[in-house]
Amino acid sequence: MTGYQLVKYLTSAKYDSYQASTSDLPLFRAAEVLLNYAEAKAELGTLTQDDIELSINPLRERADVADLSLTEANAHPDPYLASAETGYANVTGDNKGVILEIRRERTVELLME
């Protein structure tokens, strides 16, 4: 534990009450659109490295995380994410590794929303 408190969407009590709030809450973030795009292309079997460069990698670059490689992800699917106990055991096929990585990215990106 770091001791840091989550302050996402937190506003002053001066502006919020039991019956009303002036805080805008995005219902669909641009990051979620990019993740949905990449996952849909991967599930259809049409995902390319160019698609990853337009969708997943900008999200990872913003967090200073290494770029995702389609070839590398599919060559070495994460066993933790593929496990029936801890992940998505139902994911199969040629794009198994990259689908698992996209789902991990979604978990990280949308945490606490």
Predicted segments — roles?
Residues M1-E113:
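Acidic/polar-rich alpha-helix caps and helix-coil junctions
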